[in-house]
Amino acid sequence: MCVKRTDYCSSKNANSLKQQNYESYPKTMRVIADLHIHSRYSRATSQKMSIEEIARFARIKGLNLVGTGDFTHPKWLKEIQENLTFEPDTGLYKVAKNPELPVYFMTTTEVSTIFNFENDTKKIHHVILTPNIETAIQINDRLVKYGDLASDGRPTLNLDAPHLVEEIMQVSHENMIFPAHAWTPWFSIFGAFSGFNSIKECYQDMTRHIHALETGLSSDPPMNWRLSKLDKFTLVSNSDSHSFWPWRLGREANVFYLEKPSYREIVNAIRLKDKEKFKFTIETDPSYGKYHWTGHRNCHVALSSQDAIKLGNVCPVCRRKLTKGVEQRVEELADRPAGFKPKDAIDFVHLLPLSEVIATALNVNSPSVQQVWNIYNRLTEKFGNEYNVLLDASKEAMSHVTDEKIAEAIVRVREDRIKVVPGYDGVYGQPIIFDESAKEKLVSQRVQQLNLTDFM
């Protein structure tokens, strides 16, 4: 993948993107945006998740734009108002105490809707983008009728998806709403347990206001390209982060080339699928996601879609129903073969968080250990931020800052020359960078070397 003046492009990532010379866009800047995160008022979120900490680590990560998340929560909205200052003519905000920090904020939130549809209970998460705090307040005034906004940063609302869209659009047609993490088994539009089979089925006559779809960690653009009915929607990628740590924040993101960041430029680029402005998404390998394969965590069983189908989606150990993975769910809805790419598709690149790359190369269990931080800090201080390291820095230049094995690991990730043991049933996938045989060994361990035919 080429951005700016690099010459290391090769392998899958390089082939998935057209060669791009940053100098051919002399009046533009690269804007990397993570539009779906959470505040400390959301469940299972770091209590240190403040505006200042989000901005601090967004800069280190290389994010130019980050969503506020959770503007529906009264206490978080108050903190947004107190800690951010509006940037004129942008529809975006900066940190009031440090406006020189090169990080913009967009007012965003995620809501959960629970409703009945054809005698089934549907549970769908949606991301909402707004052009300013005033509009966010108007949205809150409408949504408070459907649920307790103070109960959670991501509130649960008792209304169906079409009426949610109607409420959002009645406030302003500048607002944007799209389904969150579209394929996860629970709380998603295509989820195996409480989702739909199409966007039209979910949003009904309000589908005309839906222009995008968030892929989530367990799927990537090629998986979504297999559904022809998704061609009209722009695929976006965000972290859904509940932490400011750089192995969570910005682990997936959207890359734009703009003269200046602005709400309208970003939203219009998404709505129009403008490939001149919306260049590509940053994705983790979908196998890294927690729900890529079908499986049962308690029994350490992880299965490909083919093997799960052979077993009737029943755990071969305990005989209980398996958690259907995203790979299998895509297979159920796909009407195209793997490898198909629509002609107007936004490009993508597979990456992993730099901390994860370093930890994997060092064979340590956590990206938070001091040894990883020491290398991470040296690289980001030298090259400016994490994305500069992952996307731009040459192997030779990195080798002057850290040992060659780390530099080689980063290049392999950049060029999509790694393997990942698939995640399943809430368990993250395991990246394999150097040991070519490790994936097969670990997959065998996860299915406990069972002979699947014994259970058919």
Language model features: what each stretch is:
Residues 33-35, 66-70, 106-109, 178-180, ...:
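Active-site neighborhood of phospho(di)ester-bond hydrolases with catalytic His/Asp-centered motifs
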Residues 40-42, 68-77, 114, 135, ...:
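Active-site environment of divalent metal-dependent phosphoester hydrolases
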Residues 43-46, 77-81, 187-194, 225, ...:
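Histidine/acidic-residue-rich catalytic or RNA/ligand-binding cores of hydrolases
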Residues 8-12, 17-113, 118-121, 418-419, ...:
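An N-terminally biased module of ancient metal coordination in phosphate/nucleic-acid-related enzymes
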Residues 358, 364-456:
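Low-complexity, acidic/Ser/Thr- and charged residue-rich accessory regions of DNA metabolism proteins
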Residues 25-30, 77-211:
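Extended substrate/RNA-proximal surfaces in nucleic-acid metabolism proteins
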Residues 197-204, 213-293, 298-301:
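Functional cores that coordinate and move charged inorganic groups
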Residues 280-342:
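Cys/His-rich short segments
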